[in-house]
């Protein structure tokens, strides 16, 4: 199964649909509001799980379908949004890696609007202020949340790209006031291998 089909299956076909009263509903997508203070998104599952995945499917009907893995019980949610709606300004207490499975996806990071295209990735450090921009153009985004406990494992792996190494070292050293992100555009010949790895990782989280 392709990564796109797997993400669609997770976010759009799970039978258990949670209501907007569920705390995970607002964690997945908090709309922009008049609140001045940024939201701090905490790690949503047990810290014993070093990694989680969040699948977003944005459709032309101005609805976001989403699901979190691992989750017990499994669920999905359907969230309406007006075109070009922004989420609430927020940070995370974990690293976030976003991969654009299909379509395009825009974020406002540190006050700058950046559009990511199919096959591109964005790695956002903790405490980096950003907003997600929801558009009615069809797109699928796969987010991975990386817990602090996983930093050592990442740092011990063989990472060829020096910028990634520097970024992770900075995060690992807990320079909490340093706000940063990285935008990656993999070569076309590397995309199939990368998607195969992400697919396998997602399958492991689904269990």
What feature does the model see in each segment?
Residues 2-21, 25, 36-46, 50-78, ...:
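A hydrophobic/aromatic-rich effector-binding and dimerization subdomain
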Residues 93-95, 128-130, 140-142:
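Generic beta-strand structural signal
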Residues 110-126, 136:
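Short acidic-glycine-tyrosine-enriched beta hairpin
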Residues 6, 93-94, 101, 117-118, ...:
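Short, well-ordered loop/turn elements at secondary-structure boundaries
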């Amino acid at each position: 199964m392709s990564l796109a089909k797997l993400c669609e299956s997770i976010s759009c076909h799970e039978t258990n649909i949670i209501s907007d009263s569920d705390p995970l509903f607002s964690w997945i997508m908090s709309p922009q509001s008049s609140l001045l203070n940024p939201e701090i998104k905490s790690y949503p599952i047990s810290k014993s799980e070093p990694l989680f995945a969040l699948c977003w499917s944005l459709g032309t009907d101005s609805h976001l379908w989403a699901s979190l893995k691992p989750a017990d019980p499994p669920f999905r949610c359907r969230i309406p949004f007006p075109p070009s709606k922004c989420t609430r300004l927020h940070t995370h207490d974990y690293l976030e890696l976003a991969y654009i499975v299909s379509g395009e996806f825009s974020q406002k990071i540190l006050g700058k609007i950046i559009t990511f295209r199919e096959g591109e990735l964005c790695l956002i450090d903790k405490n980096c202020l950003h907003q997600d921009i929801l558009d009615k153009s069809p797109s699928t985004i796969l987010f991975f949340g990386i817990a602090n406990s996983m930093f050592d494992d990442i740092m011990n792996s063989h990472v060829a790209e020096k910028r990634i190494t520097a970024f992770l070292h900075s995060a690992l050293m807990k320079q909490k006031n340093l706000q940063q992100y990285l935008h990656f555009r993999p070569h076309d010949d590397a995309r199939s291998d990368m998607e195969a790895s992400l697919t396998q990782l997602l399958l492991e989280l689904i269990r």
